[in-house]
């Protein structure tokens, strides 16, 4: 009887440990969507509206703070264009210094497309690493993004009104 109890305990304990961070069947739905979001990065807060095409091309319009309101960012692969008051600036995101909040958000969404989804503490997420940064994009049960964070630098994003385009 003691052996059976011990075996049962070991089995239950191993199930408990394996459930701490398990792989799951949720697929990230980070393309073909539109959303509004609030991004906090380096003690600054930004609001924006975004659309991500099926091919990954992403447009983000910054709506606040007032000094940046109206700035539109177009991302395609590693190339980006910033538009503001009729002026355009083209750049390669890999050549820009870290610190551009919405560029960081775009990179997280792009990495999530091919990321593996895990489950921890009843939260689905993808994790991507770039240098010392460890970025997590949290997903709902449908695969749509809910929030994102990088504890190493204080980056966080909250997704609102996420909709699948064309549906």
Give each language-model segment a name.
Residues 1-4:
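Positively charged n-region of N-terminal signal peptides that target proteins for export
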Residues 6-13:
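Sec-dependent N-terminal signal peptides
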Residues 21-23:
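Bacterial signal peptide processing site
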Residues 27-54, 75-76:
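Post-signal peptide N-terminal segment of mature Sec-exported envelope proteins
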Residues 52-109, 151-158:
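An acidic-aromatic
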Residues 59-64, 115-167:
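Gly/Pro-enriched, hydrophobic low-complexity segments
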